Amino acid sequence: MEQYTTNSNSSTEQIVVQAGQIQQQQGGVTAVQLQTEAQVASASGQQVQTLQVVQGQPLMVQVSGGQLITSTGQPIMVQAVPGGQGQTIMQVPVSGTQGLQQIQLVPPGQIQIQGGQAVQVQGQQGQTQQIIIQQPQTAVTAGQTQTQQQIAVQGQQVAQTAEGQTIVYQPVNADGTILQQVTVPVSGMITIPAASLAGAQIVQTGANTNTTSSGQGTVTVTLPVAGNVVNSGGMVMMVPGAGSVPAIQRIPLPGAEMLEEEPLYVNAKQYHRILKRRQARAKLEAEGKIPKERRKYLHESRHRHAMARKRGEGGRFFSPKEKDSPHMQDPNQADEEAMTQIIRVS
């Protein structure tokens, strides 16, 4: 009979599982015996535990410490070696290959992210912490592989990345405003209204933005869903640059006064007169004395005549005196007159 022998030592924290012979019983059931030296029995000085597993299905062996070891029915040897900072590294041979697969056991209070990053999570005392880790989704577009990872943490927590950055998750404001976390890949231009981004936190995790497309990081933006937000009247655009933090550019939006067409080519005196007429017209429209709808132009004939007139610099109309003056004449016409004078003299 083959036995799975488990040696547990609290001082060295080493766990060695050796595989021997497995005896098959009737009905396709395999008996596995676990021997633990930490607990002593009456007869042989060792306590024997027997597990019944179905042949052909993955075997799951639970050893001391709450660690789970799985195998596909093949004889395996698992060795757990204590690592640095209270971590345990397990080496498991991979079927079909000659190498060893290392499994790093993460202690409680720590999150292991794909890519070798470890996030330390510390919650406040007396609060129930709930951590939801979503599996990474891989999307292949035009030969480029992009991997996105999202970690949603409910409750106020402090997370620390492998680079030493400290991230504070604050889902609820002091006024009870519910915050919404949005995770987007840093692969293009992100446009967010400035009103929604007021008082938000921008946190970047993952690889640097100057690496290849496969190692692109993510930017987590915390947006307030409701609350008193002061609209700054601008649009915030986050453009990934060469640094680790994306650059933020603010573009002014057209206001109510810019949406209405302004008269062109007027001086200061005319502009002030236009403003006075607008105020007077708004007052009459509010009183209901004149309709609010205005025609495009008052008289079509005058509009055609104005469009047909010649204009000088700045769109000004030529006065009759300026038309007759020699410096305002057409240069081609002046050349023709000069040639006529030369012919007459000769």
From Swiss-Prot:
Motif, Subunit association domain (SAD): chain positions: 265-288
Feature: DNA-binding region: 295-320
Biased composition (Basic and acidic residues): 310-327
Pfam families given in the database record: CBFB_NFYA
Ranges where the record places region Disordered: 298-346
Residue ranges, compositional bias (Basic residues): 298-309
Function noted in UniProt: Component of the sequence-specific heterotrimeric transcription factor (NF-Y) which specifically recognizes a 5'-CCAAT-3' box motif found in the promoters of its target genes. NF-Y can function as both an activator and a repressor, depending on its interacting cofactors. NF-YA positively regulates the transcription of the core clock component BMAL1.
Complex and partners: Heterotrimeric transcription factor composed of three components, NF-YA, NF-YB and NF-YC. NF-YB and NF-YC must interact and dimerize for NF-YA association and DNA binding. Interacts with SP1; the interaction is inhibited by glycosylation of SP1. Interacts (via N-terminus) with ZHX2 (via homeobox domain). Interacts with ZFX3. Interacts with ZHX1.
Protein name in the entry: Nuclear transcription factor Y subunit alpha
The organism of origin for this protein: Mus musculus
Gene name of the record: Nfya
